Each structure stands twice: as structure tokens, then as C-alpha cells.
Regions:
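C-terminal-of-GTPase-core extension/linker across diverse P-loop GTPases
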Residues: 1-191, 198
Length: 198
């Protein structure tokens, strides 16, 4: 297996394209090879390319290469990202994004793509004084999410009140969410969703 893998790598191929056999992939994963990891290719392009939504020769080549390697590709403009980071007010930031016909900052996309590649998602906890985000694997059950906060919570988990981040942003009050029936109790078999508040 190792000789075949070395030959595969010496031919310019990545370790993540070596085998579709689960037992072989488990062995390869134990080597922690960089090319066995999921990859995201990011092209830093100029403002004109972002405005025109066109691709220059180099970004086209990088996109083709990423596609060939079955990887994700994203283009951003670092100078635009720098300007976005300087805005303090959300309205100013949104106006600037609209000028460039961008739905969201490139940094937000990088984070989303990264989480997706790594099979991760975020849930939140909130209290009167603090809101905190926690990272868990996708499809994690509620007790596993509770365990990220504290191991005792995982062992003693029975149920949790759950609502979604978008709902609390929209209605600004847990009391209002409760009145609207948007807070529910979930048990041990609940699969936590990205953006849940527990």
C-alpha cells in the first residue's frame, strides 16, 4: 500500500485522490499527509475582477486546478476586505458591499467554506451577560454539544431549550420567541443545527 501511495504522490497526485477503499483511507489518514486534507484555493484578485465578475488568466487556471483536484475555489480582493474591516456601522458596510455587488465579505465566505470542508458547525449559548459560540462536528447530537461547554453537561444531559440565531436577531427577545412558539425543548437524540442557540 505504501509503495503504491508513494508512486501516486510522485506522479503529482494528492493523497486524497489515492483510494476509495475505506480501510486504505484510514491507514493513509493515520500518516497525516497534508494532501490528504480537504483544500480550499483562494485567489486574491483586483477590484476590477470583483466588479466585472470576470476571471483573469491566473484565477481561471487556479479555478481549473482546484476543480481538477476536487477542491473548493474562492476569489476575493484583499484591498476590498481591508476597506470592509474599517467600517464600524453595519449600514456603511452593507452600502459598500452593494457598490461591489457582493452579498457578503470574502472573509465570511472563507470561514463558511472552511467550516464546511472541516465538517464543522456553530451553535450558541446565551445568558444575560454573555453570548458565546461553540464549534462542533456537523450532525452532532445535543449531548455532544453540551459536552463542549462542560463534560458534566454531557453526562447529565436530559433536554435543552432550543431556538435559532436568526429568530433571536429578528425578534430581539426570548420572551417574544416563546410567545411565538419558536423555542422548543429537544432531547438526547436531537441533531444540533448550525446557528442553534441552546
Amino acid at each position: 500500500l505504501i509503495n503504491k501511495l508513494v508512486e501516486h504522490l510522485n506522479s503529482g497526485n494528492f493523497a486524497n485522490t489515492f483510494s476509495n477503499i475505506k480501510s486504505e483511507n484510514e491507514i493513509i489518514d493515520s500518516f497525516n499527509l497534508l494532501t490528504a486534507k480537504p483544500m480550499l484555493y483562494i485567489a486574491n484578485v483586483d477590484e476590477d475582477e470583483i466588479l466585472s465578475n470576470d476571471y483573469n488568466l491566473f484565477s481561471k487556471k487556479l479555478q481549473a486546478y482546484a476543480n481538477q483536484k476536487d477542491s473548493l475555489y474562492l476569489k476575493i480582493c484583499a484591498s476590498i476586505e481591508q476597506e470592509i474591516s474599517n467600517f464600524e456601522k453595519e449600514e456603511e458596510k452593507q452600502f459598500f458591499l452593494n457598490e461591489y455587488k457582493l452579498s457578503e465579505p470574502g472573509l465570511d465566505k472563507i470561514i463558511k467554506y472552511g467550516f464546511d470542508l472541516l465538517g464543522l458547525q456553530t451553535f450558541f449559548t446565551c445568558g444575560e451577560k454573555e453570548v458565546r459560540s461553540w464549534t462542533i462536528p456537523k450532525n452532532a447530537l445535543a449531548p455532544e454539544a453540551a459536552g463542549r461547554i462542560h463534560s458534566d453537561f454531557q453526562r447529565g444531559f436530559i433536554k435543552a431549550d432550543v431556538f435559532h440565531y436568526n429568530d433571536i436577531i429578528k425578534y430581539q427577545s426570548e420572551k417574544r420567541l416563546s410567545e411565538l412558539g419558536l423555542i422548543r425543548q429537544e432531547g438526547k437524540e436531537y441533531i444540533v443545527k448550525d446557528g442553534d442557540v441552546l
